[in-house]
Amino acid sequence: MATVPAAEYATASVLAERGGTPVEVALAVAGPFEGSAQHVVQVNRRAEAPTASRVTVLRDGLLDDSIRGERWEVLLERTSAGSWAISEVKRAWRCRRGAQPDRFSTVRCP
């Protein structure tokens, strides 16, 4: 997966600092959804008082001629103040055309 520069998710970072949940933050990173299916999976480190969270956003059937789907991985860490901070964001694409249309790639679709 390709690492996304922090400048591209600055608005979501502010949401995290202001008390947004990990899922809210991940959806803010991924942006508006226009497609047929979206799946969100959240995995926390420690169940009752999570210290870290990984949120995966899978999107398929996008309304785009070249991009069939997207996969976002958003890693968050709990701060000493109790809010969340984004520690890393990665992204991959699934293309409609090409040699492997059923696999995610770190290269944007043509």
Model region roles, listed by residue range:
Residues P5, T11, A37-H39, T51-S53, ...:
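Generic structural motif recognizing short loop/turn segments at the entrances and edges of beta-strands
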Residues M1-E17:
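N-terminal low-complexity, Pro/Thr/Ser-rich intrinsically disordered segments
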Residues A16-L75:
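Mature extracytoplasmic domains of secretory-pathway proteins
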Residues V74-R103:
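Short beta-strand edge/turn micro-motifs at domain boundaries
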Residues Y9, V14, H39-V43, A92-C95:
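Generic preference for hydrophobic/aromatic residues in regular secondary structure cores
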Residues M1, Q38, R68-E70, T79, ...:
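Aromatic-enriched hydrophobic runs in primary sequence
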